[in-house]
Amino acid sequence: MMRLQKEAKDAGGRFFVLNGNHELQAAIGDLRYFSEDDVMKFSELPGDTRSAKVRGAFVRGGPYANWIANNPVMVRVGRDLFVHAGLESWVEYFLIDEINAMVKSWFLYFQGNGPQPLLSTGWIIGQVGPMWTRLLSEGRISEEQISSMLKTKGVARVIVGHTVTASRLPE
């Protein structure tokens, strides 16, 4: 994906990579969702064990730390809002840049690249935040709330990628 971002930029375009729960888990050293194949991709990195090699890739000085920390969790393109997992009513109170900045501050902290963010912003990386919440995709937000969120952000639709559908097809 890093290569695709560079190629898109070189061609005058853009390629967005959104941070989600797996990037957050990598930043805090939670490797539960790394397959053996994923771990093997890090075999050339320094470290005594495979898990140390993977963890080292995502902390200060690691090859992916800055890249991940600088990827957004939410991006608006035209009238579309892309977000990893979903939205809740909190989205109405923050600008997209503010949301991305809060998430970035937590990534930097977990990587050892920044101070501890205010604990009052911890919700942004928790179950109700844009990397985890499934309320929108599970239909647990009213149409009125959705309309209000869309209007506040000036978008026509929200596109999420976190939740797998039963048919594995877009719904």
Residue ranges and their predicted role:
Residues 1-171:
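Feature recognizes metal-dependent phosphohydrolase scaffolds
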